[in-house]
């Protein structure tokens, strides 16, 4: 599933080609996503100029003069730029054609993504209860410490809770906990303030670096420019269960936490 760095990579790839451009038409070949694409999307968006392409958590917000298209890539979706009129292949469900001659094409083999229309996106039911962005000053170790008091849930699913902080998915939670030396099974309420301060620093560092590297290449992900990400080449824990720790050589262990696989080093993480 594309996580925050992958979505931000996509945003940075498509924004320069969309912002300031006028939409000539919208072609919806299959509206059956996680939530149906609005039947009148072409009517709502065609003729409008795209003002800004923003991101909130893992949602892309394509802001027009009136209204905003909220897009989520789901498990396997991607948005990329193609020449308008390029014949569509299987799973290429939507084209947003621009007067420039380019089209923003949405591909989603599993159809778990979304394309929704809203006049007030930040108060949309999918966005209104989201926590702070991890790369802003609204998120820090103090917030993690305060929100974790009395929590018996394991620390990994705690930091993956979008009400606590957005965009820390399975890959980056695994890597940040490894870098901070925290066992992902530890109860969130038992982690000290000092260790949460360290964890927040690592979350920010790892997410920022992953964005710089173009995200993580996993299964279907490609950026808005059609290129894969390269952060996977530098993973220390995620997907490495049974392999030696790159720091100490101990065999990494894999456990299930909140229905997700979690890999950790029993020596480096306490």
Curated annotation (Swiss-Prot):
One Pfam family recorded for the sequence: H2TH
One Gene Ontology MF term: 8-oxo-7,8-dihydroguanine DNA N-glycosylase activity
Zinc finger extent (FPG-type): 236-270
SUPFAM superfamilies membership: Glucocorticoid receptor-like (DNA-binding domain), N-terminal domain of MutM-like DNA repair proteins, S13-like H2TH domain
GO aspect biological process, one term: base-excision repair
Entry annotated with the keyword Hydrolase: yes
Cofactor note as given: Binds 1 zinc ion per subunit.
Catalytic reaction equation(s): Hydrolysis of DNA containing ring-opened 7-methylguanine residues, releasing 2,6-diamino-4-hydroxy-5-(N-methyl)formamidopyrimidine; 2'-deoxyribonucleotide-(2'-deoxyribose 5'-phosphate)-2'-deoxyribonucleotide-DNA = a 3'-end 2'-deoxyribonucleotide-(2,3-dehydro-2,3-deoxyribose 5'-phosphate)-DNA + a 5'-end 5'-phospho-2'-deoxyribonucleoside-DNA + H(+)
Organism domain of life: Bacteria
Entry-linked Gene3D superfamilies: 1.10.8.50, MutM-like, N-terminal (3.20.190.10)
Cofactors that this protein relies on: Zn(2+)
Active site: 2 (schiff-base intermediate with dna), 3 (proton donor), 58 (proton donor), 260 (proton donor)
InterPro entries membership: DNA_glyclase/AP_lyase_DNA-bd (IPR015886), DNA_glyclase_Znf_dom_DNA_BS (IPR015887), Formamido-pyr_DNA_Glyclase (IPR020629), FPG_cat (IPR012319), MutM-like_N-ter (IPR035937), Ribosomal_uS13-like_H2TH (IPR010979), Znf_DNA_glyclase/AP_lyase (IPR000214), Znf_FPG/IleRS (IPR010663)
Described purpose of this protein according to its UniProt entry: Involved in base excision repair of DNA damaged by oxidation or by mutagenic agents. Acts as a DNA glycosylase that recognizes and removes damaged bases. Has a preference for oxidized purines, such as 7,8-dihydro-8-oxoguanine (8-oxoG). Has AP (apurinic/apyrimidinic) lyase activity and introduces nicks in the DNA strand. Cleaves the DNA backbone by beta-delta elimination to generate a single-strand break at the site of the removed base with both 3'- and 5'-phosphates.
Assembly behavior: Monomer.
UniProt record similarity statement: Belongs to the FPG family.
Protein name: Formamidopyrimidine-DNA glycosylase
Top-level taxonomy: Bacteria, Pseudomonadati, Pseudomonadota, Gammaproteobacteria, Pseudomonadales
């Amino acid at each position: 599933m594309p996580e925050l760095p992958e979505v931000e990579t996509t945003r940075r790839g498509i924004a320069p080609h969309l912002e300031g451009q006028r939409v000539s038409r919208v072609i919806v070949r299959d509206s059956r996503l996680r939530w149906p694409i609005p039947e009148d999307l072409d009517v709502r968006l065609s003729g409008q100029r795209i003002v800004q392409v923003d991101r909130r958590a893992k949602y892309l917000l394509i802001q027009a003069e009136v209204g905003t298209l909220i897009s989520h890539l789901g498990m396997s979706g991607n948005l990329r730029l193609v020449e308008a009129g390029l014949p569509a292949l299987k799973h290429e469900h939507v084209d947003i054609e621009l007067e420039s001659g380019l089209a923003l094409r949405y591909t989603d083999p599993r159809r778990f993504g979304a394309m929704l229309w809203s006049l007030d996106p930040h108060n949309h039911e999918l966005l209104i209860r989201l926590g702070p962005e991890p790369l802003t000053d609204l998120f820090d170790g103090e917030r993690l410490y305060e929100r974790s008091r009395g929590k018996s849930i394991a620390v990994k699913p705690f930091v993956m809770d979008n009400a606590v902080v957005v965009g820390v998915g399975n890959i980056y939670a695994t890597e940040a906990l490894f870098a901070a030396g925290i066992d992902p099974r530890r109860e969130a309420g038992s982690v000290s303030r000092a260790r949460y301060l360290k964890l927040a620093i690592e979350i920010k560092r790892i997410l920022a670096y992953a964005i710089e590297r173009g995200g993580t290449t996993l299964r279907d992900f490609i950026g808005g420019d059609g290129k894969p990400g390269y952060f996977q080449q530098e993973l220390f824990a995620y997907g490495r269960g049974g392999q030696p720790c790159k720091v100490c050589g101990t065999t990494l262990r894999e456990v299930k936490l909140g229905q997700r696989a979690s890999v950790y080093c029993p020596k480096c993480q306490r």
